[in-house]
């Protein structure tokens, strides 16, 4: 019996040695993935005028209330300014959603984490994402959600929110699909220093 117990003990010890252990998520290092995308920032920037037209047009600046029978009309909305820091975030996020179409980033966390990585100060923030629309006007029409009920107008409410004073927009073409991102925010200091629109094809590290 003593020998049997010893054999069993050795078996269990051996089993404990070879059993795989689950690693904690915060112990796993994200492995960067490099993808080649084609940016389309010249066209992406044209969406700013479309947003501001909706914000300042009394016929367009509305959204459904939760009862889906009455509307909230957004009066006296100011035009959004284009923020080139937010554009940088939107471009990064556009590449990320090409890998994982979600507001959660491929490496975990959310879009707002990118703001911190880019040292962007902000108050309120919101994000719209879209895929497959080939032109700026098409994606803007989808985000407007004119014919959707309250539950389907989240993108529209971002576009018409009085909490935001600026926006940056990103557009990439990857693996045959167009991806679009709008980053809205309230910023005490908006970066309006224009940079050349990036319409190049380049390798992007998503990490």
Features from the language model and the residues they span:
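Short, compositionally biased P/S/T/A/G/V-rich stretches that sit at domain boundaries
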Residues: 186-206
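Sec-dependent signal peptide cleavage junction
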Residues: 17-27
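Bacterial N-terminal signal peptides that target proteins for export
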Residues: 1-8
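Short, well-ordered surface patches within globular domains
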Residues: 26-118, 156, 162-167
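A well-ordered secondary-structure block
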Residues: 92-96, 103-188
């Amino acid at each position: 019996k003593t020998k049997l117990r010893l054999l069993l003990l050795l078996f269990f010890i051996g089993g404990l040695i070879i059993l795989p252990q689950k690693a904690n998520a915060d112990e796993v290092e994200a492995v960067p993935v490099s993808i080649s995308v084609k940016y389309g920032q010249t066209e992406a920037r044209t969406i700013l005028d479309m947003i501001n037209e909706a914000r300042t047009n009394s016929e367009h600046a509305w959204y459904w209330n939760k009862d889906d029978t009455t509307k909230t009309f957004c009066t006296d909305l100011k035009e959004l300014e284009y923020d080139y820091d937010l554009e940088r975030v939107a471009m990064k996020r556009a590449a990320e959603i090409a890998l994982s179409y979600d507001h959660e980033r491929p490496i975990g966390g959310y879009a707002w984490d990118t703001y911190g990585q880019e040292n962007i100060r902000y108050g309120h923030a919101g994000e719209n994402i879209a895929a497959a629309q080939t032109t700026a006007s098409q994606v803007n029409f989808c985000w407007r959600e004119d014919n959707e009920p309250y539950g389907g107008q989240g993108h529209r409410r971002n576009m018409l929110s009085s909490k935001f004073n600026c926006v940056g927009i990103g557009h990439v073409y990857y693996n045959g699909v167009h991806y679009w991102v709008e980053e809205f925010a309230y910023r005490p200091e908006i970066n309006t220093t224009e940079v050349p629109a990036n319409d190049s094809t380049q390798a992007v590290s998503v990490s």
